[in-house]
């Protein structure tokens, strides 16, 4: 059983116990507050595997999950923002993460310059937007929406 959960350090700065009609834990950040009641169902979390991108000096910033192959199994789509890649990973039969496809979304940043640019790619979603009943990968990069249709 995992007893420590990593919190996004940029979002939450403090964890405090509170009583709001029952025991709870609050997560406090500069512009956000969340609370978790300590009652109800108890979940046991178990680490299955871990993944480090093979992209040299890469930084995995965010992840979404979706079935991009039509197999009925979801893949993990990591947004790698240091070198601007999408990195697809899936679980094998032994519940181990296996690298799949990866590609660079763009070669260089826009005219705004890199100093104050947002991490790119910054948003992804998996949905059928082409109307062929197959999930597609939708990516927000700079001021563009890119659609990668499933073949």
What are these model-derived regions, one by one?
Residues 1-151:
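Beta-propeller-forming repeat regions
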